[in-house]
Amino acid sequence: MVAIGENQQAGTLHVSPTTCWELSVATQKGRVAGRPHLGEQPVARWFREAISVTEAKIIPIKQRISCEAAQVVVTTGHKDPGDCFLMATARVSKLSLVTRDGIIRQIAGADPNYLDIVVC
């Protein structure tokens, strides 16, 4: 969380729109450990407000990121579409990916040059 705060203060906090999709999917799950608690707000509103408050910059998903997301599957064997788009966005944008996802952490641990992460 320190890294998020530091990037926020520096004006260099970036977010993928895939994060909104991931939040939406996660909140639709039943009582699962680690499920996000966004209160009664719809995810879209919560995400929009979070972007506004943090002044994060949204990185649009363009062709290069989409192609890289497909390559993530080939390179890592990981087939979760959201994770692949998040990793592709970080790789193409040359940014660290903030995550607590165990599989993404394994991928980054196996080859730190492939993906830079910040564990939260």
Give the label of every model feature segment.
Residues 100-104:
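Short, polar loop motifs at secondary-structure junctions
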Residues 1-79, 84-96, 106-118:
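PIN-domain endoribonuclease scaffold, especially VapC-family toxins
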